[in-house]
Amino acid sequence: WGRGVCPFHNEWYWSNGTGTVDGKIFGFNLGTGFGNTSQASENMLFYNGKYHKLGRVHFDLDTEYMKPWRLYDDEGRLDLTLTPCYDRTTRMKVLFVDNCCHQMFGGFSGRAVLDDGTVLQIDDLQAFAEHAVNNW
């Protein structure tokens, strides 16, 4: 969970998207690094009006942000590849404040498994993922 007062150095990964899979609304919210996620997290799939909770999610990426990113979980219920098409980079450096964020937009492909075991094939769902490093 996030907190009202963040530490001076904070780094997180976050991804979010909504589209359709098999003609039904599908969405996800995935993140790691923001706050204490040992007891709860923001990782969730949404499909056809129902939510499906995920555990810990990993973001595997290269230092060259335009290369594909892999997002997967510990339980084998999520395995997505983001193929970026645009890097929206923001950078702010003033005195001791030093913030940098790469928001990558592109297509997500792979699979997601719902609570009942249903496997969804994701094919080029347009969404984003970001890597933020903040010193504030």
What role is predicted for each listed range?
Residues 1-136:
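Structured soluble/peripheral alpha/beta segments that form catalytic or ligand/cofactor-binding pockets
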